[in-house]
Amino acid sequence: MPRRRVVGQRKILPDPKFNSELLAKFINVIMQDGKKSTAEKIIYKALDTASEKKGEDHLVILEAALDNVRPSVEVKSRRVGGSTYQVPCEVRPVRRNALAMRWLVEAARKRGEKSMALRLAGEMLDASENKGTAVKKREDVHRMAEANKAFAHYRW
């Protein structure tokens, strides 16, 4: 642990089109090899497509999708006397968002549509309706935590 002062978190600049910090973070998650403009094009195209299909506002769809993918508990490995236990722990809000975004992008990359924008739009629509691969991932994590509830007293 550092003995000096705790370094504060950097302020993230909101994205240029919708002026949303959440969307700016999502763009950074999508971005590969530092190609931010490409990531922005993909996200904006995906949001436009999803908005057309569902008939709702862009940010409402994104927020609904992320809400349905955010985990509330996860398991962490903890060694106790030679054996390793999967201990269920609550997820901090910042990590919840990060995991939700990461899972949404991973699920979109595995889909079969032609372009990444269409894949992401499809996954966001699925997630906003509480179905799809990203939501399944969240359910699996929650199920794992529920199964290991007996080890909750090992929490640290």
UniProtKB/Swiss-Prot annotation:
InterPro entries: Ribosomal_uS7, Ribosomal_uS7_bac/org-type, Ribosomal_uS7_CS, Ribosomal_uS7_dom, Ribosomal_uS7_dom_sf. Pfam families: Ribosomal_S7. Keywords: Ribonucleoprotein, Ribosomal protein, RNA-binding, rRNA-binding, tRNA-binding. The keyword Ribonucleoprotein applies. One of its GO terms (biological process) is translation. It comes from the Bacteria. Disulfide bonds: none annotated. GO terms for molecular function: rRNA binding; structural constituent of ribosome; tRNA binding. GO terms for cellular component: small ribosomal subunit. SUPFAM superfamilies: Ribosomal protein S7. NCBIfam families: rpsG_bact. Belongs to the universal ribosomal protein uS7 family. Part of the 30S ribosomal subunit. Contacts proteins S9 and S11. HAMAP family: Ribosomal_uS7_B. One of the primary rRNA binding proteins, it binds directly to 16S rRNA where it nucleates assembly of the head domain of the 30S subunit. Is located at the subunit interface close to the decoding center, probably blocks exit of the E-site tRNA. This is Small ribosomal subunit protein uS7. It comes from Shewanella piezotolerans (strain WP3 / JCM 13877). The lineage of its organism: Bacteria, Pseudomonadati, Pseudomonadota, Gammaproteobacteria, Alteromonadales.
